[in-house]
Amino acid sequence: MQDRDMKVQLLLTGNEIMSGDTVDSNSALIARRLGELGLGVFRKVTVGDEVALLRRELAAMTEDADLVIVNGGLGPTVDDLTAEILAAVAGVGIERHPQAVTHLEAWCAGRNLPLNDANLKQAMLPAGATVVDNPIGSAVGFEMNVGNCRVICTPGVPGELAAMLDGIIADLAARLERPPERRVLRLQTFGLGESSAQQMISDALPDWPAEVELGFRAGAPQMEIKLTIDRASAEPALRRCRERLQALFGDHIIGEGDTLLAERVLQLLRDRGETLVTAESCTGGLIASMLTRIPGSSEAFHAGFVTYSNAVKRAVLGVSDETLTEHGAVSEPVVQQMAEGAMARADADYAIAVSGIAGPDGGTPDKPVGTVWIAWGARGALHTRRLLWPVERSLFQTMIAAAGLDMIRRTLLGIDTEPRYFSQRRAR
């Protein structure tokens, strides 16, 4: 296979993508993994489950590209057409592949399922195709050459695709005539916006080196700053840029690579042999969910209390009637008592407690929609802050959950300076 200048195209299939019922995240993942090899996607096409259209598009791609990755259409149903389409474009027949059958037998046996005709459809592959292992799902991938183009077919289920890409990328790397020089460094941040980050860089680092490409990817709750170089000789410049960004953004940087805020918090807690508990009202358990998505979270996360009503705040966490009556559920004394009660009941070292008004209703002149009180810290050393985050309900919950985690991260790291979003989101 030729070097990193090869032309790569993606073909995504499925009516569910065309209709908007499914959001395409797979192409971004594929492009990102290919970028590790210095390979860029120069064209992406999405086509519904139409045989003629799929056949025409794949045929055109194989004439124009060195590598085509097809995503979707590998399952057991009648609208899974990829094997049929590739066989037609390659001018070969369809045959039952023994390795695919063996995979299906093991997959069904492990789940106590019968190996029926619908499942066996997934073993019908283009003649001459090579199986690409799927370590999670029932549908194997497959690949073959069509003329001078290599075609790799992958399943549309995101988790299965992600699991398969490790092997696919390793195989592609072995086939390249020269090792990739492209390097991508990703810095994960919280509390910074794209425009403010760009302005800070422009003001503080006007001599940014041309050989280091700077990019941003906004998300909720994190923002990614991406640095890219295309040749190994630019590695010193990349290191200098990383050091300068770390000095500029400092405590807003969570970590490198794909580090998640919850992952960083758990790592810090594990390193210290300490534990965390959450007490949530307006976020409805989202902080606990973010934490428990991380494997091994039970080593540091003791419990999560979702105390949505005042009655449950009283009964479960011991928030007093007097405090609720005098100050209301969205108040500093209430989140303090929520945090204290949670730590006492879970025997944890640290707590995060949140109570706010997610909207769209429930606001008052004194406490408008978007108002939230956060408490965080250790026993006898709790901190509190009132913020105003007037955004759509689900985004409010995401950002408040992340803010709570961020404050615990800062506490564990001994960071005393306030984050930028404290001044930007200060409630008046």
Model feature map: region roles:
Residues 31, 35-60, 96-137, 312-349:
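Glycine-rich oxoanion-binding loops at beta->alpha junctions
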Residues 235-428:
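Short alpha-helical segments enriched in small residues
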Residues 13-15, 70-78, 155-156, 230-231, ...:
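Glycine-rich beta-strand-to-loop/alpha-helix junction loops that act as flexible
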Residues 8-10, 151, 276:
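Conserved hydrophobic helix-helix packing surfaces used for dimerization/oligomerization
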Residues 143-144, 216-218, 372-378:
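Short beta-strand elements
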Residues 145-221, 228-230, 236-240:
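Accessory alpha-helical/coil subdomains and C-terminal extensions
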